[in-house]
Amino acid sequence: RLKNPFNIDLDYIINGQDYQGYDKIKLSNVIQDPSFLREIMSYEIARKYMPASKANFVNLYINDTLLGLYTNVEAVNKEFLSNHYGSRNNTFFKGNPATLDLNGENANLSNSPGADSVNYYPFYNLKSDFGWTDLYNFIDTLNNHVSSLENQLNVDQTLWMHAFNYSLINFDSYVGYAQNYYLYQDDNGLFNPILWDLNMSFASYRLTDDSDFWSGFSIAEAIVSDPLAHFNSVSVYPRPLMRNVFNSERYRRMYMAHIRTIMEENIVNASYYNRGLELQALADSSVMNDTNKFYSYTDFQNNLTNMVTDLIDYPGLTQLMDARAVYLQTLPGYQGFPTLDTIDIVGPHIVGSNLAITLKVADADTVLLAYRFADRSVFEKLQMYDDGMHGDGIAGDSVYGATIPEVANTIQYYFYAENDSAGKFAPVRAAYEYYTLKTQ
């Protein structure tokens, strides 16, 4: 084939050379995607909720000859890490088995390879100067000491990644055969999973070693894919980053809250369809002029809404996602969530003082306030009470209160409330987004 992907290092000859702050160009050849939309739209959605790559269209010319329309995807490298985590030299891995084994565990983060880190080399690609001991210690905690997991894992970002993968049926990922993700250990010592390789999202890739669909699954089955399949069912090979995390009822409710947010903000309101139309119009002439594309121009025109059949069936994006939204809305944890209303900051906003915060909440059994004083530090969590003893006014009036001790000049905070049915964040994109308060 003429239209191959490209991975170009701009600093290969001149160390430190870059273009607009980027020293690597990764060009995807838009294979497995007749719509030409999957990768760009997926990254745009993901960036609302977690660190994820930027992506756009590129017409690629080589020696003044047009090779075709590509997707230009920001590399997950040291520059990416610096921008999102404020550091770049900590332990950094790619979950990328040297040989993908459809009958094996791949980069599933299980401890099956044993206690010698050498046995993990075939499954994980070390991107930093060191880190095998850190990775093994994390895997050991994930599999054997789950009660300590929050000390080694950014749980919220993990839940967002899983929510994204299951909402958009992005199974060429940790979900399907445990690949195509990164792990970076930030300055807090927490591992952060990072999405990668989204060209087969929206059910372009329909393979998984979840036992319910061992031999693959249809578009109709993708629509009703259970987002807790690796918890509710049997995984042929372990998925501890899902199953062991989902053992917590609270994490399951948080996960479903994130799924709800992704679906309501992008799918239910049809914004993804409108964005698809915009991108389709932007790419139209370039797709028409791409003589090396893998699918026809008619396929490109149709696949936003309708199935295209080639080697496999590629669902239309709206065909898949509108029906998936209807299905997900029926699941436990999607409906029946608490209502979070009025926020009130009580008392003077003075550095070093204690700051009381109240929140009006309906239909909640538990309300949490998460706060921190600096970017990228870990959120501390306080339980809020409606007992008349925590600055909340009258007991039982649905106003919950808590006090943040010895505040700094900047407070970043968010809320989480849950009942037996469902959970709700405020703001809904927390912890990636949060409220900010300046003190005196």
Predicted regions and their residues:
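Middle-to-C-terminal accessory/interaction subdomains
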Residues: R1, Y124-G176, N180-N354
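Internal "kinase-insert"/substrate-recognition segments embedded within catalytic cores
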Residues: P5-N15, Y22-V30, K48-V58, I62-L168, ...
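Aromatic/His-enriched, Gly/Pro-containing loop or helix-boundary segments
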Residues: K26-F36, G393-Y400
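Short acidic-glycine loop/turn motifs at beta-strand connectors
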Residues: I62-D64, D186-N188, N419-S421
